[in-house]
């Protein structure tokens, strides 16, 4: 049984790190897509007429 003073399992540390990175990337993607600079984004398919 683990107590709060014992070291956590390395697998838990790796899982929390991966989860934090994925959440950060998701947040950055949403901020890029819908944030204040999103008005400057253009769609290259709409800009190119054939």
Curated annotation (Swiss-Prot):
One GO location term (cellular component): plasma membrane-derived thylakoid membrane
Membrane topology value: Single-pass membrane protein
Compartment(s): Cellular thylakoid membrane
Alphabetically ordered keywords of this record: Membrane, Thylakoid, Transmembrane, Transmembrane helix
GO annotation, biological process: photosynthesis
Residue stretches spanning the membrane: 14-34
Statement: the UniProt record of this protein carries the keyword Thylakoid: yes
Major location category of this protein: membrane
Keyword set includes Transport: no
Superkingdom of the organism of origin: Bacteria
Family annotation (InterPro entries): PSII_PsbN (IPR003398)
Its job: May play a role in photosystem I and II biogenesis.
NCBIfam families per UniProt: PRK13183.1 (NF009650)
Family: Belongs to the PsbN family.
Protein name: Protein PsbN
Organism, as annotated: Prochlorococcus marinus (strain MIT 9515)
Organism lineage string: Bacteria, Bacillati, Cyanobacteriota, Cyanophyceae, Synechococcales
């Amino acid at each position: 049984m683990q107590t709060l003073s014992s070291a956590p399992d390395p697998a838990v540390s790796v899982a929390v790190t991966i989860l934090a990175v994925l959440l950060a990337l998701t947040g950055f993607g949403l901020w890029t897509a819908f944030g204040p600079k999103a008005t400057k984004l253009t769609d290259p398919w709409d800009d190119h007429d054939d």
